[in-house]
Amino acid sequence: MQASSEYKVLADEILTGVVTQTKIGSIVKDLVLIVMFACVMALCAQIVIKLPGTVVPITGQTFGVLLAGGTLGSKRAPLSMLLYMLIGMLGVGVFAPAVADVNEFGSLHAILPWAGSDGLVWSIPTGGYIVGFIFASWIIGRLAEKGWDRKPKI
């Protein structure tokens, strides 16, 4: 295959022929995947390892971005990250817990009890990362569409 060949991403490979006989079925499938991965991202955000001396913890969000990009591709993955960001900005506690919230659980917090934070991305310490998730998921999705998730290209 040529270097410019397009590959199917994981979601398209697994869901081949599922409710895609019509344009509406395809749109519904895409919307369900976008919402589902916004929820996966909210779950990944709750996996937190607090680092001493910083307000930005290590979270499972990095895994969530990579998973969304590789699974959904460059069109749906950024939309799922954008939806995740908008849900948090609307007041739902889907972002990683603040370091103060993590302190009451020790240095590690794993999903339950739910301690997510919310707020405008430009007013929280991790806001730049959240905006960056949109671009990172697009890059990973594009690489997956080029076949970089199948074999080394070096």
Regions found by a protein language model. Name each.
Residues 2-22, 29, 35, 43, ...:
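Short helix-perturbing small/polar motifs within transmembrane alpha-helices
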Residues 70, 74, 78, 89-92, ...:
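Gly/Ser/Thr-rich helix-start
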